Regions:
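Conserved N-terminal subdomain of the carbohydrate kinase-like
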Residues: 1-58, 83
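Short low-complexity, flexible loop/linker segments enriched in glycine and/or proline
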Residues: 16-19, 100, 161
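Short gly/ser/thr-rich secondary-structure transition/capping motifs
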Residues: 32-41, 93-99, 127, 196
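Acidic, amphipathic alpha-helical patches
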Residues: 43-44, 104, 172
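Structured loop/turn residues at beta-strand edges in well-structured enzyme cores
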Residues: 49, 109, 140
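Conserved phosphate-binding/catalytic region of the ribokinase-like
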Residues: 76, 126-212
Length: 212
């Protein structure tokens, strides 16, 4: 926590509403908050701290000025560590699909791993299959694409092929944080096993743990 900083501005608020099946919808209060208005001087020097992995995503990668500040910093981080990117699309905040896609593609090009939901892919790339999008990203340099599909489970796609694990039947209370948990487990596996090991049976084991 020694890297934590204090701002006079309030924190962004995310107001969550749940439907009868536990699905979440969001309303965001972002104007005038510290979350999207900060200085590059706040960010740690990657050459000093030598990070193992950078996990980044959601609105801070698409809302200015934060997105540009973070992208410049992430380019420095990429010299030392792989980047895991989760678009976590929030079209209620930015409903301009072309701008959103441009922002996502910029981060994908910098990332080793992309974790994305089938809903996000459907909104970003209507008419394209998730496999087509994933293969295009991999051709561009991404090592692993993990696609979350809710109750249908997870798919991991690498240059070697696709690995699929089914969902686990549970009584859903709410879905908030489910995708974040998947991302955390993937990051843990990258640190423990190395990104190049996440293929075949090893990837299947990781995805199964994430699905549970």
């Amino acid at each position: 926590l020694d890297l934590a900083l204090v701002s006079d501005k309030p924190t962004c608020l995310a107001i969550v509403s749940l439907d009868e099946k536990g699905g979440a919808s969001y309303e965001f209060k972002i104007e005038g908050t510290a979350t999207f208005d900060f200085s590059s001087s706040w960010l740690p020097d990657p050459s000093r701290y030598k990070p193992q992995v950078l996990h980044i995503g959601t609105l801070v990668t698409v809302i200015e000025p934060a997105c540009d500040v973070l992208y410049d910093w992430a380019m420095q981080v990429a010299e030392f560590a792989p980047i895991v990117f989760d678009p976590n699309v929030r079209s209620v905040v930015l409903n301009d699909r072309d701008r959103y896609v441009a922002a996502v593609e910029r981060w994908v090009a910098l990332s080793s791993v992309v974790k994305v939901s089938d809903d996000d892919l459907a909104w970003l790339y209507p008419g394209e299959s998730y496999s087509e999008v994933a293969q295009r990203w991999i051709a561009g340099g991404v090592t692993l694409v993990v696609i979350t599909r809710g109750a249908a489970g997870l798919i991991g796609i690498t240059a070697e092929g696709a690995v699929e694990v089914p969902g686990v039947k549970v009584d859903v209370v709410d879905t908030v944080g489910a995708g974040d948990t998947v991302g955390a487990i993937v990051v843990e596996a990258m640190v423990e096993k190395g990104i190049l090991a996440l293929t075949g049976d090893t990837l299947k084991e990781v995805l199964h743990r994430a699905a549970v």
